[in-house]
Amino acid sequence: MTKNIGKITQIISAVVDVKFTNNGKLPEILNALECYNDTRRVVLEVAQHIGDDTVRCIAMDSMEGLVRGVEVIDTGSPIRIPVGTETLGRIMNVVGEPIDGKGDIKSSNISSIYKPAPDFTNQSTERNILVTGIKVIDLLAPYTKGGKIGLFGGAGVGKTVLIMELINNVAKAHGGYTVFAGVGERTREGNDLYHEMIDSGVINLAEPEKSKVALVYGQMNEPPGARARVALSGLTIAESFRDMNEGQDVLFFVDNIFRFTQAGSEVSALLGRIPSAVGYQPTLATDMGELQERITSTKHGSITSVQAIYVPADDLTDPAPATSFAHLDATTVLSRQIAEFGIYPAVDPLDSNSQVLDPMIVGEEHYSVARQVQQVLQTYKSLQDIITILGMDELSEEDKLTVARARKIQRFLSQPFHVAEVFTGAAGKFVNLADTIAGFKGLVEGKYDDLPEAAFYMVGTIDEAIKKAQTLK
């Protein structure tokens, strides 16, 4: 088969025009084109047919050294990347090239990054809880298999540690794999995450096949084309794990979904499209929908997505986060105020919520205990001004009891993490859902009113708190 070869006629920033004259056949929209700058391969993606046998492309890599007249080869298909278990423990870029310096990824399975969402008949409509082993999440903002979770958190509140614990726990409890897509990541943060995963055993360098995670990075310094597509590359690997013969529960992290939108906006502007509200691309809802609709459960397995979301200027009505919210099933909010108390994970129990915290799905007991816990914490929050100004002595006996229970609940919402054992010295705890519900039920009913507050801090189950209380006496 003869290769379809064109030549670069124009380069403007990350946009490249390529003219095909040999046989009059133009590459299809979204096809990957290849050109070489010395020995470096540069991948271009066809975005528009602009007439005169010319296609307009978006570059997936730096354009340094490319000039007009360079030959470009049509690959005949969209961007294709290696998928399957060979990607575990490895870092690749948007076009599937390894960037961890450990040689080629030897996978027999190669897949296009563009796929339709699963057919309606193949999708699973069951809503099953994905038990994470993290008490505060499982009780108050439970995740569903195949659900989409928004993770809101600033710098230094424990977002990375929470992500790694979720990776660790899902792998242990469900035998699942994880895919991490760094979209517009700081290179330093991506590097830190990789080394922390090695230290905590999530990535096994000696035996990569025993690793639990595959990483796909499109860093902040990459062209907008790479940042706009890297989430799709990560999702393609996650889909391959989900659709394996035995079926898998896969965890898919995107950090940061806002940067996916931002990169799409840059690409749109470079292609000369008229912007919509606040300068975003006119196809914002479509781009987001195409990504989010592929994140779903099928009869084989599930992809549960945790998406870090940056909110520009804390404006929740901004089109980028507002478009993301429409797809979310649960929100996990990390609070700096809670982190300052030394309570980790620093999940805000009142701001975090989940659509599946419903008695029809989680059961009457779980729902009732969760709402009682939130009620106690909300009452404590409303009493804090009085406590600050007048002190505890001015409260009624009933309010004093509520405050005491709330402080115990706050501390019991903390727990030691497996991935933090290295620097805390405390053994990590995976807490079953039944133990979580039983522990908090006892707390709100007053069964443990006689135990000291300190007994509930950084323990797993309520039995551990009772044992700890005996050592404190």
Swiss-Prot record:
It is a peripheral membrane protein. It is an enzyme of class 7 (translocase). It catalyses: ATP + H2O + 4 H(+)(in) = ADP + phosphate + 5 H(+)(out). CDD domains: ATP-synt_F1_beta_C, ATP-synt_F1_beta_N, F1-ATPase_beta_CD. The keyword ATP-binding applies. It holds the Pfam family ATP-synt_VA_C. GO terms for molecular function: ATP binding; ATP hydrolysis activity; proton-transporting ATP synthase activity, rotational mechanism. ATP binds at residues 153-160. Belongs to the ATPase alpha/beta chains family. Produces ATP from ADP in the presence of a proton gradient across the membrane. The catalytic sites are hosted primarily by the beta subunits. NCBIfam families: atpD. This is ATP synthase subunit beta. It comes from Rickettsia rickettsii (strain Sheila Smith). The gene is atpD.
